[in-house]
Amino acid sequence: MDAAAMESLILELHAIEAVKFGAFVLKSGITSPIYLDLRMLVAHPRLLSTVASLLGSLPATRPYDLLCGVPYTALPIASVLSAAASVPMLLRRYHVTPHAAAECLDGSFRAGDAVLIVEDLVTTGSSVLETVAPLREVGLVVADAVVVIDREQGGRENLAANGVALHSLMTLTEVLAVLVKRGKLGEEKAQEVKRFLDANRKMAVPGLPVKPKVVRKAFSERAGLATNPMGRKLFELMEAKQSNLCVAADVGTATELLDLADKIGPEICMLKTHVDILSDFTPDFGHKLRSIAERHSFLIFEDRKFADIGNTVTMQYEGGIFRILDWADIVNAHIVSGPGIVEGLKLKGLPKGRGLLLLSEMSSAGNLAHGDYTAAAVKIAEQHSDIVIGFISVNPASWSVTPSSPAFIHATPGVQLVAGGDSLGQQYNTPYSVINDRGSDIIIVGRGIIRANNPAETAREYRIQGWHAYQSSLS
């Protein structure tokens, strides 16, 4: 918007009393000498249309698929923009119960869709972030917000800290300058407002602490740091397929598992199995699964959770009816029995180029894998980096002791599009939260995909969301 158009718009907003001066208590709790009331736009359809059109012309950092207006004043603006630009719109209900993000949204969307937030005013940015949260909870990507007026009181900075770029038609400073220039505002009152702005330039969002963003090296770069060939292969495969999705194939029969693997194979980097729950297991199961894995380029992770002494686990790994060593690229282990378990698995796995994940944390409520246990897992991993490729973890960003090398990968179970839990104590987090807030690399999804009506399509949605979260964590 050029200077002349902005000046004309400011004068029109002043004429309809959308800009007022006095003493007003804002949502943030502070008293302001100026009040901006853009609700008045609904009484002036031509001006409403102009504002919507101008907002639509603001450049976003990425193309968007949907619009979402912040309740309530911005809703008519977003509606007009949606109709004019033929961009579908989502409605966010204002009151929503915890872990019910999907229920607070009306409209049609898919995980991975990009949403442009539409707002009338931004002070601290809290209202925008309250709308961003449920959108991200259901797998939508939010990178931009457009606003009519930026009050310049910390909103831009608070939003940027949460991964949202703010684009405004005008700032409050520009509004004051035009009104003084055109004789609509006295210099004394303008100075009072400016002093207020100077004293309140960077306000924190009330009750919404800014989480530090986890920034990581690219998978392609970390591949070169891996000492284990399977760890290197996993990084390279994720980069090539643009997938950091692992599906937990917790089904009851080998027939179901092989069918599922073939359907979702193109979307995943890894398939997690529990071979000992397959009621129809036969010795050729491993060969059949490896054929599917090779066809679709994914790794097989047998979630055996070895926990015994070294001598016993070598026999469990290599022998028995399952012969896990023959077909599983990766296995995992508890460290309760000490480093001997890793040495035993390494004895058999390393000559075959296999990889090992250590259980450093778990996603079930009340588990004991945390604190000193997690620190011990890190120490053992670094002592055996030739076989250990990473960890099963829940919140590696919170660890007091962290691996010295980014070659170790983190895979996190308990991921769904909406946060919450189940009746057996499993705790679920969203892909965005797991990758950006908790610092993991791979999302492990089970019931969210295997119980879906269309597992392949649902896996694609999770893959897109997980990959977008990874990409946003690179800078």
Curated annotation (Swiss-Prot):
User: What EC number(s) are associated with this protein in UniProt?
Assistant: 2.4.2.10, 4.1.1.23
Report the catalytic activity: orotidine 5'-phosphate + diphosphate = orotate + 5-phospho-alpha-D-ribose 1-diphosphate; orotidine 5'-phosphate + H(+) = UMP + CO2
Cross-referenced CDD domains, in alphabetical order? OMP_decarboxylase_like, PRTases_typeI
Q: Which residues form the active site?
A: 305
Q: Which GO terms describe its biological process?
A: 'de novo' pyrimidine nucleobase biosynthetic process; 'de novo' UMP biosynthetic process; pyrimidine nucleobase biosynthetic process; UMP biosynthetic process
- Pathway linked to the protein: Pyrimidine metabolism; UMP biosynthesis via de novo pathway; UMP from orotate: step 1/2; Pyrimidine metabolism; UMP biosynthesis via de novo pathway; UMP from orotate: step 2/2
Q: Does the keyword Glycosyltransferase apply?
A: yes
Q: Which GO terms describe its molecular function?
A: orotate phosphoribosyltransferase activity; orotidine-5'-phosphate decarboxylase activity
TM spans, by residue? Answer: none
> Which keywords appear in this protein's UniProt record, sorted alphabetically?
Decarboxylase, Glycosyltransferase, Lyase, Multifunctional enzyme, Pyrimidine biosynthesis, Transferase
Q: Which family does it belong to?
A: In the N-terminal section; belongs to the purine/pyrimidine phosphoribosyltransferase family.
Under PANTHER family, the record lists: OROTATE PHOSPHORIBOSYLTRANSFERASE (PTHR19278), URIDINE 5'-MONOPHOSPHATE SYNTHASE (PTHR19278:SF40)
| Database matches in NCBIfam families | pyrF
The record's annotation in HAMAP family points to:
PyrE (MF_01208)
Q: What is this protein called?
A: Uridine 5'-monophosphate synthase
Protein source organism: Oryza sativa subsp. japonica
